[in-house]
Amino acid sequence: SCNAYRIGITGPPGAGKSSITNQLIKHYRKKNKRVGVLLVDPTSPFTHGAILGDRIRMNEYHSDDNVFIRSLATRGSKGGLSKNINYISNILEYAGFDIIIFETVGVGQVELDVVESVDSVVVTLVPESGDDIQIMKAGLIEIADIYVINKYDRKDSDKMYLFLKNMLSMIDKNKWMPPIV
């Protein structure tokens, strides 16, 4: 049956998106789920090449037939994803993968296409993700189903937590309240 659950991992560059993705793979494999991972890397505007290096950090799964990891380049796509990512995710779904994780490039203010492609969005932030205004401008506040404050041992992590908590207090109480973890 084709009913894969799609999870988008997004956030600014260096927030630890690949670390979160790695932990999700581990979690779902313990539950005997087949996991497809589509990692998106930016394309250089100068050379038009891409490093495609995120999967190097996930080499513990290279011999696991129930984990498929593919790096994709943006190739001019401005939304934080690769143009073909939805087609590839459909192929993974038809191939029997239960969970499909989309990891976006480090996002800015207009790179929020992940919302249209997944069932749940995990916004990964770090204490130094920027001041409150920058985070609001980036649009990340509105798209999260779950917030992850990564690298919580760093300075100002409590400040980031309080900022998110205050922002969420303004949301209609009858709507989904994204947890902060």
Each model region followed by its residue ranges:
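P-loop (Walker A) phosphate-binding loop of NTP-binding proteins
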Residues: 12
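Divalent-cation-assisted or electrostatically stabilized phosphate/pyrophosphate-binding catalytic cores
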Residues: 135
